[in-house]
Curated annotation (Swiss-Prot):
It catalyses: ATP + H2O = ADP + phosphate + H(+). Keywords: ATP-binding, Helicase, Hydrolase, Nucleotide-binding, Nucleus, Ribosome biogenesis, RNA-binding, rRNA processing. This is ATP-dependent RNA helicase fal1. A motif (DEAD box) lies at residues 174-177. It is an enzyme of class 3 (hydrolase). PROSITE patterns: DEAD_ATP_HELICASE, HELICASE_ATP_BIND_1, HELICASE_CTER, Q_MOTIF. ATP-dependent RNA helicase involved in 40S ribosomal subunit biogenesis. Required for the processing and cleavage of 35S pre-rRNA at sites A0, A1, and A2, leading to mature 18S rRNA. It comes from Emericella nidulans (strain FGSC A4 / ATCC 38163 / CBS 112.46 / NRRL 194 / M139).
Length: 399
């Protein structure tokens, strides 16, 4: 599993896919540039995952594409490889634009593109809010083949004419369900309006609710679809449990009781609001527990340093809002705790997908008050899954 994908689970994935989509069993069968193939193998990929073997060829043909697959199945590499195949590195202009809902995800995508394009002399810039605008302007004026960014900063740079759009061939919307949620919808339209009419659109996400699929009709032409059936979307290899806590006030004591279990590997604890993250972090520290925390209101430098500490394993328990839930890849995370159940059932799968990355075993524990029982049942029904009461030996499941 050097390439980080669980092949057994991958082989069992069911695809509900457009008829014209063929399967390319190897990267060589995709007729990719030699320099790109070298980068793919150097990155640790040996053969394409299920979603890669179906989607890359279609995207490289220039087809508008909707690709849906579980977390940890190589979705980021799917569009990164495709973008690197279609760009011409001789032309130092932006030719592919990737939009993501969080700064951390945009930065991670940039690092994947740089690694896969290592032998291509590719220029890729992360254009994200909370960073120095002067640096953005300098990098963009120099010329970037690929820009990976958040919608607000990208729209701003286009309006200021530092991000030149006339050579853009491909727009990728990653975690499209979140991007197209109300918060980013207008900014995406802002960006889209500036792109050449022939721009290819690629939509990628673990969940694609029907309203998102409906919205894509506005800016996609006859898209090819590579969709996993929803019944297949519960993340295999992740055991899901709940703890009945009756009252909100009891959650804190329950978490303290679990702390020794959390630190066996690394754990992420999700709360629904920034204020709750700050409150819980303070409470845990007052009780002499070591935790770190992150949410969208923190300065970007602080968020970067917290992410780096967590990635390197220097901090073991991270308390966060959903800013962390989407696509962030930290391979050691084996445990996710939903201190609050997510208000949006699509976010449930993004959160628990943080544990068990790339086919490792993971555990997700949901704190459920009497008010939450209905939400939990709704999640079970929506994903055709079963969430059991947590057993006493949860530590054994993690070790």
């Amino acid at each position: 599993m050097a390439d980080g994908i669980d092949r057994r689970a991958d082989d069992k994935m069911e695809f509900n896919t457009s008829k014209e989509v063929t399967v390319a069993p190897t990267f060589e069968d995709m007729h990719l540039k030699e320099s790109l193939l070298r980068g793919i193998y150097a990155y640790g990929y040996e053969s394409p995952s299920a979603v890669q073997s179906r989607a890359i060829v279609q995207i490289c043909k220039g087809r508008d594409t909707i690709a849906q697959a579980q977390s940890g199945t190589g979705k980021t590499a799917t569009f990164s490889i495709s973008a690197l195949q279609v760009i011409d590195t001789v032309v130092r202009e932006t030719q592919a634009l990737v939009l993501s809902p969080t700064r951390e995800l945009a930065t991670q995508i940039q690092s994947v593109i740089m690694a896969l394009g290592d032998y291509m002399n590719v220029q890729c810039h992360a254009c994200i809010g909370g960073t120095n605008i002067g640096e953005d302007i300098r990098k963009l004026d120099y010329g970037q083949h690929v820009v990976s960014g958040t919608p607000g900063r990208v729209a701003d740079m286009i309006r200021r004419r530092h991000l030149r759009t006339r050579h853009i061939k491909m727009l990728v919307l990653d975690e499209a369900d979140e991007l197209l949620n109300r918060g980013f919808r207008e900014q995406i339209y802002d960006v889209y309006r500036y792109l050449p009419p022939a721009t290819q659109v690629v939509v990628v996400s673990a969940t694609l609710p029907y309203d998102v699929l409906d919205m894509t009709t506005k800016f996609m032409t006859d898209p090819v679809r590579v969709l996993v059936k929803r019944d297949e979307l519960t993340l295999e290899g992740i055991k899901q449990y709940f703890i009945a806590v009756e009252k909100e006030e009891w959650k804190f004591d329950t978490l303290c009781d679990l702390y020794d279990t959390l630190t066996i590997t690394q754990a992420v604890i999700f709360c629904n609001t920034r204020r709750k993250v700050d409150w819980l972090t303070d409470k845990m520290r007052e009780a002499n527990f070591t935790v770190s925390s992150m949410h969208g209101e923190m300065p970007q430098k602080e968020r970067d340093s917290i992410m780096q500490d967590f990635r390197q394993g220097n901090s073991r328990v991270l308390i966060s809002t959903d800013v962390w839930a989407r696509g962030i890849d930290v391979q050691q995370v084996s445990l996710v705790i939903n201190y609050d159940l997510p208000t949006n059932r699509e976010n449930y799968i993004h959160r628990i997908g943080r544990s068990g990355r790339f086919g490792r075993k993971g555990v997700a524990i949901n704190f459920v008050t009497s008010d939450d029982v209905r939400i939990l049942r709704d999640i079970e029904l929506y994903y055709s899954t079963q969430i059991d009461e947590m057993p006493m030996n949860v530590a054994d499941l993690l070790s």
